[in-house]
């Protein structure tokens, strides 16, 4: 349906309005394409069944509790009535001197989103470091809403392509679904493995990352070589 905006802002020129209307048409096309891609994602057939019920370590819900260590299974991450699990692979391996700044920036925002997301799905963050080290970092960041897991004693990261053969960590978000008492892989952000366009990185989770979406609205954009840091 043909549609034209009647909105006008103070002092805008005819050139501005013509360019903005063209951009608005492109934004509407993008909005439609985003939904079309989301529909394709929703219609994916079931992926492979979980090869094993991976065991993880986690601490108490209260990050101030530094003594409690709980051992559980991936199946335990599913709550009653919620049959989808999103599991983010946090690049913080035992050989890394510090956590990945990019992952950290993403998780800073996900921590705020988590209480809302929890109404619709199960959400957790997994890293290869020992659970005590993961929680210490989370305390320093002020994360209070993320369920943090250590995969130090299992092969989850390797099996689901969040770890290289040399032990390097990759920032993959994977989704699993529970069907009839079994757990299946549903989706992973495989765009992280695809070649990036010139002047870009893989942008595999950018749709979920407020920082980049905000910067994309600005005349300056993201910047050619700017990336989040652990501190400023």
Question: What label would you give each PLM region?
Answer:
Residues 1-85, 90-115, 119, 137-140, ...:
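Non-globular targeting/processing and membrane-anchoring segments
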């Amino acid at each position: 349906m043909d549609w034209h905006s009647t909105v006008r802002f103070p002092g805008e020129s005819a050139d501005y309005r013509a360019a903005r209307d063209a951009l608005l048409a492109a934004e509407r096309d993008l909005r439609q394409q985003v939904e079309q891609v989301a529909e394709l994602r929703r219609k994916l057939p079931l992926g492979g069944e979980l090869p094993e019920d991976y065991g993880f370590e986690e601490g108490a819900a209260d990050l101030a509790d530094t003594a409690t260590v709980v051992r559980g299974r991936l199946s335990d991450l599913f709550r009653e009535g919620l049959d989808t699990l999103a599991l983010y692979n946090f690049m913080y391996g035992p050989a890394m001197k510090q956590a990945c700044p990019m992952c950290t920036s993403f998780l800073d925002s996900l921590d705020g989103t988590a209480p809302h997301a929890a109404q619709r799905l199960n959400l957790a963050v997994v890293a290869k470091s020992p659970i005590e080290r993961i929680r210490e970092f989370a305390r320093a960041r002020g994360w209070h809403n993320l369920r943090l897991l250590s995969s130090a004693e299992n092969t989850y990261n390797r099996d689901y392509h969040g770890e290289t053969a040399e032990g390097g960590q990759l920032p993959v978000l994977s989704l699993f679904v529970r069907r009839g008492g079994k757990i299946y892989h549903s989706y992973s952000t495989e765009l992280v493995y695809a070649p990036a366009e010139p002047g870009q990185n893989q942008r595999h989770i950018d749709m979920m990352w407020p920082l980049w979406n905000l910067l994309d609205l600005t005349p300056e954009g993201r910047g050619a070589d700017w990336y989040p840091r652990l501190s400023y």
